[in-house]
Each structure stands twice: as structure tokens, then as C-alpha cells.
């Protein structure tokens, strides 16, 4: 009986929440009940039908749930905040949230951990120490005012220092200072901030891989990273296109389904600068890179220690392996030609 119910619950999850990164269906068979939570109303209805047919209680919560109260939103107050797979410090680091970004709060656990949804749709956990909580109206107010984006800005206030990662958000003040998400006012001591619209124009003046190298060259590889302090392959691609006003999913396999398909070419014929090259590990898309032209790619690779430019057509074991595992090329931005 239990095995049958577990299969039914698994089938519901696969149907209504096929990707656990983009939704939640965390339900288990307990003595006398189905228990857990989900973000899908359709999954909730199906689980209730399964429980009723089996004579079980349906203790399944729809997220966001009552643990959130009125605080449905979180603004990141740390310079960068890790998003993790489970609500514990040692859990896998799956992504990051930058200062000033707004997260949707889905569940609160033990007053320490929050299950959240990021703007790119990613679902994960974050420790409450990294954020400030508030209502949806509070978050909308901050988002409307936080029109500045960091270009490696270093802020100072009465001896305190605060570094903002590339792309982090701040609000302009009439005094020329900036306000951060925790309400503090700062002077800009180094680096710069730009209005988002201005940054978008500046980013589009150069090809995407050139912009990526300008701001990320030499950044160390970090699984789940999104900043020049540490970035993975899909984080680099996502950040590069975010600066251009193009929203991409977080992970490489998700990025491989966006945009327009470009026919594969052994020499790169037909590729344009900024096309996203997608590589497999033999099972799934596991790496992405930006085509730079003349056979070169820009990517963040563990084998290279971080962000660099490589010759994809070179006669080296690494380049040959990449060519052998190239399975798709996607154009995520309208061609300039």
C-alpha cells in the first residue's frame, strides 16, 4: 500500500512540478496522512484526491503558507547571499542572491531559514540573516527606488565599508549618496553605480563575450556563483545577458532551451558573438560558453580555474573534448546583422 501511494505521489510531482528547481512538491507518505507542501494548486488537488481514495488525511500545505505571515518578500541586505538546496548551513550551494534583489518568501522554518523563489524562478533556501523581510508593498517600493546597479562599487559611511558585487542594487539619493536595502546611506568611495537603463545601453555597445571578459576575467570558478568573486558557467552567461536586459534561466540545461537554435558547425560558421554554446557531460547539458568569434569562447570552467577565453578549435585535448561534447548552440539575443 505504501509503495503504491509513494508511486502515486511521485507521479503527481513529475506531472505538475517536473523540475524541483522551479517549483516545490515535497510530500511524503506518513502514518495516516500525506504530509508536506507544494507550490502547485494542481498538485495539491491531485494529492487530496489520492489521500481521500486511500482514506488518509491530506496534510499538504500550499506555498506560500501561513508561516510567512504578511512578510511575503525578502530583500537581500548582505553583499551576496548563498542559496542552498536544504535548510542547513552545510547544504549544497546552488545559486546566489545579490544585494538589493527581491526574493519571494514561500515558507519560514524555525525563524532561521526561508524557502524562497528568486526572480529567475529558482527555488531554494536562504538563511534569514542575509535578508530583511517585509510586505509585498514594501518590496515594490524598494524595487521601484533601487534603480542603480553596481559596477564594483565600494561604499563608505562613517568608517564602515561595504562592497557591492557587479549588478547589485541600490537606490539613488538627492545628496548624491546611495541607499542600500538595509536603509543605510553611503558615499561612493570607489567603483561606480549606474542607472539600470544606462548600464543596459553601455553593455550593448560591445559584444556579450567582450563585456563578460571586461568584468569577469580572472574570476574564480565557484559552483552556484554569480559574481566576479566567484562564478560558474551558467552564472557568467546569465549575468552577461542580464546586463543587456535579457533574462535567462539560472542553469546551463535550462539556458540550452532558450532563444533560437543555431545549426552546429565544425568551424563555427554561422555563429555570432554572444551565441551560447552548450556542452554535455554525456547525460545532460552541464556547461555553457559564449562564442567570441574566430574560434574562441569565453567561459567559466573549473578546469581553467575560472573565467577565461579559450580557442575552441585548438589542437589540444581540452579543446577536442569540448568540441566532441558540443551539442547545441542557442542565439538568445536578436541578431545585429
Predicted regions and their residues:
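...with weaker cross-activation on analogous glycine-rich loops/strands in unrelated enzymes
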Residues: 247-306, 312
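Aromatic- and glycine-rich peptidoglycan recognition patches
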Residues: 133, 195-199, 264-267, 292-337
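Short, well-ordered loop/turn sites that connect or cap secondary structure elements
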Residues: 91, 97, 164, 270-271
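Structural motif
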Residues: 101, 168, 274-275
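Short alpha-helix capping/helix-loop boundary micro-motifs
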Residues: 86-92, 152-160, 257-267
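Boundary regions of SH3-family modules and the immediately adjacent low-complexity/disordered segments
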Residues: 25, 45-70, 88, 110, ...
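Short glycine/threonine-rich beta-strand-turn micro-motifs
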Residues: 22-47, 113
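Active-site nucleophilic cysteine motif
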Residues: 213, 225-244, 248-249
Amino acid at each position: 500500500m505504501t509503495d503504491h501511494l509513494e508511486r502515486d505521489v511521485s507521479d503527481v510531482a513529475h506531472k505538475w512540478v517536473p523540475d524541483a528547481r522551479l517549483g516545490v512538491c515535497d510530500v511524503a507518505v506518513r502514518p495516516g496522512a500525506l504530509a508536506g507542501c507544494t507550490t502547485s494548486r494542481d498538485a495539491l488537488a491531485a494529492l487530496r484526491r489520492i489521500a481521500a481514495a486511500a482514506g488518509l488525511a491530506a496534510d499538504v500545505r500550499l506555498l506560500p503558507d501561513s508561516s510567512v505571515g504578511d512578510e511575503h518578500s525578502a530583500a537581500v541586505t548582505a553583499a551576496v547571499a548563498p542559496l542552498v538546496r536544504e535548510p542547513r548551513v552545510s547544504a549544497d550551494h546552488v545559486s546566489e542572491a545579490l544585494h538589493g534583489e527581491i526574493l519571494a518568501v514561500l515558507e519560514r522554518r524555525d525563524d532561521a531559514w526561508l524557502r524562497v523563489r528568486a526572480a529567475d524562478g529558482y527555488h531554494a533556501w536562504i538563511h534569514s540573516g542575509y535578508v530583511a523581510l517585509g510586505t509585498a508593498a514594501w518590496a515594490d517600493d524598494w524595487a521601484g527606488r533601487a534603480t542603480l546597479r553596481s559596477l564594483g562599487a565600494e561604499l563608505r559611511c562613517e568608517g564602515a565599508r561595504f562592497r557591492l558585487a557587479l549588478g547589485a542594487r541600490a537606490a539613488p539619493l538627492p545628496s548624491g549618496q546611495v541607499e542600500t536595502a538595509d536603509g543605510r546611506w553611503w558615499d561612493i568611495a570607489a567603483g561606480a553605480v549606474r542607472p539600470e537603463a544606462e548600464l543596459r545601453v553601455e553593455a550593448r555597445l560591445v559584444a556579450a563575450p567582450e563585456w563578460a571578459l571586461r568584468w569577469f576575467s580572472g574570476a574564480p570558478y565557484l559552483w552556484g556563483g554569480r559574481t566576479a568573486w566567484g562564478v560558474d558557467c551558467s552564472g557568467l552567461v546569465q549575468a552577461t545577458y542580464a546586463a543587456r536586459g535579457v533574462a535567462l534561466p539560472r542553469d546551463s540545461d535550462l539556458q540550452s532551451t532558450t532563444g533560437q537554435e543555431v545549426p552546429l558547425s565544425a568551424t563555427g560558421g554561422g555563429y555570432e558573438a554572444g551565441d551560447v554554446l552548450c556542452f554535455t557531460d554525456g547525460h545532460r547539458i552541464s556547461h555553457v560558453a559564449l562564442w567570441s568569434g574566430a574560434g574562441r569562447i569565453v567561459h567559466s570552467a573549473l578546469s581553467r580555474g575560472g573565467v577565461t577565453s579559450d580557442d575552441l578549435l585548438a589542437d589540444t585535448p581540452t579543446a577536442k573534448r569540448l568540441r566532441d561534447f558540443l551539442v547545441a548552440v542557442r542565439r538568445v539575443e536578436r541578431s545585429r546583422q
